[in-house]
Regions:
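Gly/Pro-rich turn-and-neighbor structural signature
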Residues: 1-106, 208-209
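Structured mid-domain segments that build the active-site/substrate or prosthetic-cofactor binding neighborhood
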Residues: 86-92, 99-209
């Protein structure tokens, strides 16, 4: 998947605080048009055959939506086949979801989720602090609203996050088994995961604790 667009230094606005909304949108359009042209020249002339994604982080959302005076990127034809990857609020809660009108857009939808976060107003790192039941609730809601093309999760340092990462990937891979139609299965999943990883060291009674 080729990521499209451009972010500013240290995840800031591209042109800085002094630039207008229109200036930032026009600049992004120039960047994306150039990227698409390079993809045509170097990868495939048919852009529909090249998976592309635009991540809509919080500093990019204003450019995506625009305002009453400036058209945003969301209806720009150059992005028709590009997957729009939405982001939650950095703490595992959905912020925005596709509307009924644009749920079936050609490029589809993705979600960027967090198990680890470094930034304002507070960081949480190096420890598994996300309940699987919350992951189930939030990502099932995302799936039901049409976010089914790309799921990405920020795990930070991998070592403390093996369980939630495994759950996130299994939920995406086998949604019929673990998704919306299977509520209250996170305990069952945890037990299966423990058996897979450490089964030889625990008897059944200990696994149920």
């Amino acid at each position: 998947i080729i990521t499209m667009g451009m972010r500013g230094e240290r995840d800031s606005e591209i042109l800085g605080h002094s630039a207008t909304l229109k200036e930032n949108i026009d600049y992004l359009k120039e960047v994306i048009t150039t990227q698409n042209q390079l993809i045509k020249e170097c990868v495939n002339e048919d852009l529909d055959q090249v998976p592309r994604m635009l991540a809509l982080y919080k500093e990019v959302e204003a450019y995506f939506h625009g305002d009453e005076n400036t058209q945003g990127l969301k209806d720009w034809k150059e992005l028709d086949g590009v997957t729009f990857m939405l982001c939650e609020d950095n703490f595992g809660n959905m912020r925005t979801l596709p509307t009924k009108e644009n749920r079936d857009r050609k490029g589809g939808w993705g979600m960027y989720y967090h198990f680890d976060y470094h930034g304002d107003p507070v960081s949480y790192e190096w420890v598994n602090s996300t309940h699987l039941s919350k992951v189930w609730e939030q990502m099932c809601e995302a799936y039901d609203y049409g976010i089914r093309d790309i799921w990405v999760v920020n795990v930070g340092d991998l070592k403390p996050q093996e369980l939630p990462l495994s759950y996130f990937l299994d939920l995406a891979y086998d949604f019929d088994k673990w998704g919306t139609l299977s509520p209250n299965k996170t305990g069952e999943y945890t037990k299966e995961w423990i058996c897979t990883q450490f089964g030889a060291f625990f008897n059944e009674e200990e696994q149920d604790r």
